Amino acid sequence: MVGPEIERLIQLLSRLPGLGPRSARRAALRLVEKRESLLVPLAQAMADAAARVRTCSVCGNFDTIDPCAICADHRRDPSMLCVVEDVAGLWAMERTGSFKGRYAVLGGLLSALDGVGPEDLGIESLVARALDPAITEIILATPATVEGQTTAHYVAERLAPCNVTVSGLAHGVPVGGELDHLDDGTITAALRARRVF
């Protein structure tokens, strides 16, 4: 039997992605065991994040400044805008180091089943940004799911009147992927996105 404080810690940890009740219990135990070296610094870091981290008013990224460091970076290409589902998508793009433009975070995907419509996403602010003559290309980097592709098509339609090129990420065979390990949809997408050598 554990005390109410530890039980609450376990319950909160189990709400994190990838942590079920067992993993949360192990994590809580480790935190309590390493109180001075782990629990106290983690609690301070979480308090600091709760107090200082905010959503960028331009792109939707999380940062301690507004606009965020990406939007404020004058070395980034102002002509390219990458549209992502959420901040996790933005961080994934940044991790590659291959995109040097700016971002627009939608805050989700269209989903009739979940009751998420266009008004629930950052589409209006994206369309307003697309009217900036400095922006010449918008890359739709939504997931290769039904909801992701539905959202991409809707956004592309909304951007059609704007004077920008709208492109999407290629889908298909991952680097190091073998054909016999891929599903039919991935192989079909790879065939459609083929390129000339």
Curated annotation (Swiss-Prot):
Gene3D superfamilies in alphabetical order: 3.40.1360.10, RecR Domain 1
Domain of life: Bacteria
Zinc finger (C4-type): 56-71
Any single Pfam family the record assigns to this protein: RecR_ZnF
GO biological process terms, semicolon-separated: DNA recombination; DNA repair
Molecular functions (GO terms): DNA binding; zinc ion binding
Family: Belongs to the RecR family.
PANTHER family: RECOMBINATION PROTEIN RECR
Name of the protein this chain belongs to: Recombination protein RecR
